[in-house]
Amino acid sequence: MNWITNYVRPKINSMLGRRTDMPENLWIKDPETGEMVFHKDLESNQFVIPSSGHHMKISAKERLKYFLDDGRYEQLENPKVVLDPLKFRDEKRYTDRLKDAKAKTGLEDAIVNALGTIEGLPVVVTVQDFAFMGGSLGMAAGDAIVHAFEVALQRKRPLILFAASGGARMQEGILSLMQLPRTTVGVDRLKEAGLPYIVVLTNPTTGGVTASYAMLGDVHIAEPGALIGFAGPRVIEQTIREKLPDGFQRSEYLMEHGMVDMVVSRLEMRQTIARLLKMLLKMPGEQKPLEPEILPPAVVAAEARPQA
């Protein structure tokens, strides 16, 4: 039986041109409802599940493709930094973790910077990729964010930042924490120049990034259902020994309590941010041309007649 299964059947399938492999992730499960969604339907809907509206995590490059005009952009080269300055090792060496993350994502680190346009408006866009070590903030990510602010200042462009992070990168210790004040200075310089800075908080945005650049925007937009906060809900419950309210630290809860300005679907993000940029840049909105009012001759004659 093994000979038939392992040799004869594959040989017949090969001769007949049959496909014996099933593509991975052909069907994707909705984490909220358990519904199975065909991957092509999900891709065409920007990885927002049509029935429930659940926003799946997406990569930095997918984010740029969906967000910018025609999916076209120029990716900026990030500054080079010293790898593993502390020679850190836990269960694995930090350098090995970096190699694994690079192989998994195709990125050099968690930040991707790009130049592009939104409805014709030139912008600088910074995206954190959660798939790269949880989007953690280290020296490379910090330098990349500071570089994005510098490019925005040089080119006099607004900056839009998509945050997705678990916080500071523990393998870099105090060097990671130093990125909090560095990025904050970058935000201040952009604001002094009068350039808009819009932050989009995606799932999840936690830890040190919420104590720095991620909560310093002119406008804060959150994707639906995103977890946003400094410490996670489990840590808070264990610390205060109390049950947290339903939806605590989720986008909708934070908007109700004034922590974010609006909750916007990924499908409407481009139009919303373009409208905000036009307002912040004091650009004239689209106005319909005035239609001339044509009056009947009798009315014109009556208005022209001198009054007694």
From Swiss-Prot:
GO biological process, one term: fatty acid biosynthetic process
InterPro entries assigned to the protein according to its UniProt record, in alphabetical order: AcCoA_carboxyl_beta, Acetyl_CoA_COase_Trfase_b_su, ClpP/crotonase-like_dom_sf, COA_CT_N
Catalytic reaction annotation: N(6)-carboxybiotinyl-L-lysyl-[protein] + acetyl-CoA = N(6)-biotinyl-L-lysyl-[protein] + malonyl-CoA
Primary role: Component of the acetyl coenzyme A carboxylase (ACC) complex. Biotin carboxylase (BC) catalyzes the carboxylation of biotin on its carrier protein (BCCP) and then the CO(2) group is transferred by the transcarboxylase to acetyl-CoA to form malonyl-CoA.
Boundaries of every CoA carboxyltransferase N-terminal domain copy: 26-295
Gene name of the encoded protein: accD
Keywords: ATP-binding, Cytoplasm, Fatty acid biosynthesis, Fatty acid metabolism, Lipid biosynthesis, Lipid metabolism, Nucleotide-binding, Transferase
Family the entry assigns: Belongs to the AccD/PCCB family.
Organism field: Mesorhizobium japonicum (strain LMG 29417 / CECT 9101 / MAFF 303099)
Name this polypeptide is given: Acetyl-coenzyme A carboxylase carboxyl transferase subunit beta
E.C. code: 2.1.3.15
GO molecular function term, any single one: acetyl-CoA carboxylase activity
Signal peptide location: none
